[in-house]
A protein has these predicted regions:
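Short, contiguous alpha-helical
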Residues: 58-107, 154, 158-203
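Start-of-domain marker
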Residues: 23-64
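Stable alpha-helical elements in mature extracytoplasmic
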Residues: 29, 33, 40, 44, ...
Length: 203
């Protein structure tokens, strides 16, 4: 869980606006979560479709990430979040803590997607270029996300009644943890779109 805590406290919510009062309505269906996971997957894949290796590897500056590095980072963070998710749902359910949750689903999504707050990725989330090809990196993301979507679709885990303490937001549930993952994907899809919009991006 140490990796997950570092991720949550450093990589995603630095600068997050203090949440408002808790929303009492609990969405037990999976519609929002599945929509977020599917849409952010599809948007990322659409943005990288048809790009050449030169385009995928282009950097706006030596210390900035390329498109393919954004993809690898998203995959690394998703795997860390899934490790934390599985650990969380294997613990005894604690529905009595639902009353302590302050952050709404919408606040989590908007807070992570906001790129006006620049943050440094944890070391385990920094791209390592461990793939034999750019196509393999994209395939790895696709397989990881499809596996996560399959889990959400088929699981009987009570995601809303497994609550963990977030170092910034306070208590959040296992459902919200996966919303965080989808929003993180969108955050870096925005980043790779900025790379593609750079005047020096290969044609």
């Amino acid at each position: 869980m140490k990796k997950l805590w570092l991720l949550l406290s450093v990589a995603t919510f630095t600068g997050f606006i203090a949440p408002g009062p808790a929303v009492k309505t609990v969405k037990e269906d999976k519609t929002l979560l599945l929509t977020q996971l599917q849409q952010t997957r599809d948007n990322l894949l659409k943005d990288v479709q048809g790009l050449t290796d030169a385009q995928l590897e282009y950097k706006t500056a030596p210390d900035r990430w390329s498109v393919i590095e954004c993809v690898e980072h998203v995959t690394l963070i998703e795997k860390a979040i899934m490790e934390g998710e599985q650990h969380l749902v294997q613990q005894p359910a604690n529905p009595e803590r639902r009353k302590d949750i302050k952050a709404t689903d919408e606040q989590i999504i908007k807070g992570v997607e906001d790129r006006s707050h620049k943050v440094k990725a944890p070391e385990f989330g920094v791209p390592k270029h461990n793939y034999s090809s750019n196509a393999e990196a994209i395939k790895n993301f696709t397989e990881s996300r499809n596996k996560l979507i399959e889990y959400v679709t088929n699981t009987n885990d009570d995601l809303r009644n497994h609550v963990m303490d977030h170092p910034v937001l306070g208590p959040i549930d296992a459902y919200q943890l996966l919303l965080l993952d989808a929003a993180h994907t969108n955050r870096h899809t925005q980043q790779l779109e900025e790379v593609k919009a750079d005047p020096g991006f290969p044609k």
